[in-house]
Structures are given as structure tokens and as C-alpha cells.
């Protein structure tokens, strides 16, 4: 039996993780969850799974859930804030922490979980983007597995199993291309949030949907792959694959390419991470190769989708630059969703902040938190938010 904590249990990944646990009750037990403020969803989770601990970040949501548990004589202990997230990430009885919260908020609980010897099922890209070197070194120090939950890194992880790192030539990360695949800059001038949120293949949260539309999501995955698999940026390629059947590939020095293929369904990488190193029977629709008419691959347009280009630049620069990129992107996406900036301004703001805030500093926890705060305060004043 594996005991599980889910950070971000009410979001897209968290909800699908609950689906996996629901199907595998004999092997997986939900011990603790966190959420921001979706108290109605949290109450439903408490009713069904009866976790020992629940954390809410927002004060009003915390009070509502706490009152519900008291009134209904439910034993779930309700905690709040970052202190609560760290507490449930370091519980002695927990084996695996699923980090599916969005943004920098996942960084400190993930590091604390690693220091407590927990395996990490990682869906929070920002943790590795801003502090990848620190996270990976901590994982090695504490003999902890970092198990990627997203489809691309989960695919690469599987393609690398049983092979030697020195035999790898290139990692090939696939991208669906998002809702604006094939568009040029001039065609994206009047894009509204409702257009950018319509992903052709995946049902995701609002922030990651916008990142997919700008290809920033793929840029974050490139940086993540660099740290997860120890491969130079020159050897991490992005290809646009609109069918989303090939989830990523590894090219070896002898010319062989190993690809992981599956029906696009996030439950598969989640299930693989939670059951690692074993594979379990899945309810995911199997691939029918007779129905797959074609698989196509295209070169990404980095001029139109500037955030992808900037992610490569930030990764190669290293230090705190990925943290600057990430902080600026989180704010820029929020500004776009609120109608305060245009779609193409997202890339412009990333470029502006990278130029303004770069310092030759090691990516320590203190440094990345500090520079992230600087970027957010600057953009907050600029746009009065």
C-alpha cells in the first residue's frame, strides 16, 4: 500500500490523480490533500476518500471546510496556508507526494518533501524550472525518486529505462502546437483569452492552457528535461506533433529512436508515476494502429512563439534566469487572462524582465525566491495589480 499526499487536489491533474486512486484502492491510499479555495470540491473529496488531513490556502475556504468537518463529526484535520502544505508533504506515513499545484507555490513543499525522503510525482513544472539543480541534488542526497507526471517527461523517462545516459544523442519533446499551430504573428494580434483557452487535445487548467497557446509550456518542459535527465540544451529538441500520439522520443547515438506512444490521456503518466516501478492494468483506450491514418511532425516557429525561444535562452544562461522567466510568465499570463495585456505582449514582457533583472547568481532557494519577488513587484506596479 502506497500512502499519497496530493498538493493541488482540485485542479486538472489532482482530479485525475483521484480517479487513479479511486480505481486502485487496494494499492493506493489518500492520506492528505491541499487546495487553494475550492471548498465545495474539497468537501466532496473528504466525503469520499476521508483523508486524515486537508489544507486550504484561502482563509474563508479553510473556515468553511473546518466547520463542515466539525458539524459532521468527520475526523479529517483541516489546516491552512504554506505551513499546512509543508506539514502534509512531510508526514512520516506518506510514501509519495503528488505536486500538482500551479506556480512557485509548489517549490518549498516539494523540497521539504524530498528532505523527508518522499518520492515526488512531479506535475509542478515551476519547481524544476526555477530550482532544478537544487531539487535534483536534494533528490540524490536523500535517495528520492523524481517521477515526472506530465506526458512528455513521463514518456522520456520510459524511453530511457534500461539504457545508458552516455548513449543518448538527443531528447525529442513533442508538442501539440496548441490552438494556434501554423499561425503567424500578424494572425495573433487580436487573440482573446477564450480563444487561447481552447486546446485541441488536452483538457487543462487556465494557466497551463495559455502556456500551451504561447508554447511557453514546451519551453518550461525543455528546462525541466535538462534538469531531470541531465542533457544539454543543444540536445533537447522540440517537434510539433498535432496528433499527440507520440508523447516524446529519445534518439540514441547509433541512430535508433525510441518513442513512447499512447492515446492522449493524462491518467496514464499519473498511474505510471504512482505505481512505479510497476505497471498496472489501465482503463485508457488502447491505440488502434489501423485507425491512425498518419503521424506528422513539424518544426516549431520560434519567431511567432517567442516564449519558447526565450525559454531556451533562459535555460542556457542558467542561474536565476529561469526563475526570472517563470515569475514574469506567471504574472503575464494572469494579466492576459484579466484583459490587461494582449496575447503577443506575454513574450514581450518575458524579454523585458529577462533583460532587466538578470544577475549572475547561483540558483539557491533564497536567490530564486528573491528574484521572483522582484519580478512580480515590478510587474505589479507597472500594471497596477
Curated annotation (Swiss-Prot):
GO biological process, one term: isopentenyl diphosphate biosynthetic process, methylerythritol 4-phosphate pathway involved in terpenoid biosynthetic process
Gene3D superfamilies on file: 1.10.1740.10, NAD(P)-binding Rossmann-like Domain
GO molecular function: 1-deoxy-D-xylulose-5-phosphate reductoisomerase activity; manganese ion binding; NADPH binding
Residues that bind 1-deoxy-D-xylulose 5-phosphate: 125, 151-152, 176, 199, 212, 217-218, 221
Biological or metabolic pathway of the protein: Isoprenoid biosynthesis; isopentenyl diphosphate biosynthesis via DXP pathway; isopentenyl diphosphate from 1-deoxy-D-xylulose 5-phosphate: step 1/6
Positions of Mn(2+) binding: 150, 152, 221
UniProt: NADPH binding residues: 10-13, 37, 124, 126, 205
Catalytic activity: 2-C-methyl-D-erythritol 4-phosphate + NADP(+) = 1-deoxy-D-xylulose 5-phosphate + NADPH + H(+)
Enzyme class: oxidoreductase
Known EC number: 1.1.1.267
Taxonomic superkingdom: Bacteria
This protein's record includes keyword NADP: yes
Cofactor(s) needed: Mg(2+); Mn(2+)
The protein's role, per its UniProt record: Catalyzes the NADPH-dependent rearrangement and reduction of 1-deoxy-D-xylulose-5-phosphate (DXP) to 2-C-methyl-D-erythritol 4-phosphate (MEP).
Protein name: 1-deoxy-D-xylulose 5-phosphate reductoisomerase
